[in-house]
């Protein structure tokens, strides 16, 4: 692999990494807003049935190459991270 190709691919990966970071931060803001609203309504913040529906929906629309197991592991961690972040 040429140095120019390595550089170009690394730049593209870095762009995707920044996009992922932006998306996670945007998701955290939305979840924090949802949590505040649920608290005012007396609704439990965590909804395990909704989390499972989310995972199933993502599995259905995942074009790959991320495996089903990989998707579940990734989103389980994102959900856990989200709960930790909005509860701090």
Where on the chain are the PLM-derived regions?
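Domain-level signature for soluble enzymes in the chorismate/prephenate branch of the shikimate pathway
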Residues: 1-88
